[in-house]
Amino acid sequence: MIKVQKQKINILEENKKLLKKKVGAVVNFIGIARPKNNSGKIQYIEIEHYPGMTEKKIKEIEIYVTKKWKLNNCIIIHRFGKIKPGENIVYVGTAAQHRNNAFKACEFIIDYLKVKAPFWKIEQQKNKKIFIKSKKKDEKKIKINY
């Protein structure tokens, strides 16, 4: 299941959905907006996306990881809009018979979302805006695996 939404993510509700099927392991990742970075305090982060294309790309990755790591269930939720420090940005939950598969799939999804998914992120600081670019180390992980 994938969602791209403005509202905050209800982590407990999403976790319950992962447990509906008989599984041996559940792995979650919750991305949180940071209060500051190396260049200063962050007032908020603004995330934009390409409606339709974003969902399509995330659905493709959900299908890929479900098959590759034999997942019983997979949930990917990413927010857009203005997000304040401390609020959740992204939720990834993977469920599988074995923990190794659930961990690998979850990590791959996060790396994919950071590098390949059509989201644009801008940090608003007191007197400046900073466009957030993907990191080369994350890009290398995706090239190796996908």
Give a label for each model feature:
Residues 93-95:
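Short hydrophobic/aromatic beta-strand micro-patches
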Residues 1-88, 97-107, 111-146:
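N-terminal, polar/charged subdomain of small-to-medium soluble alpha/beta proteins
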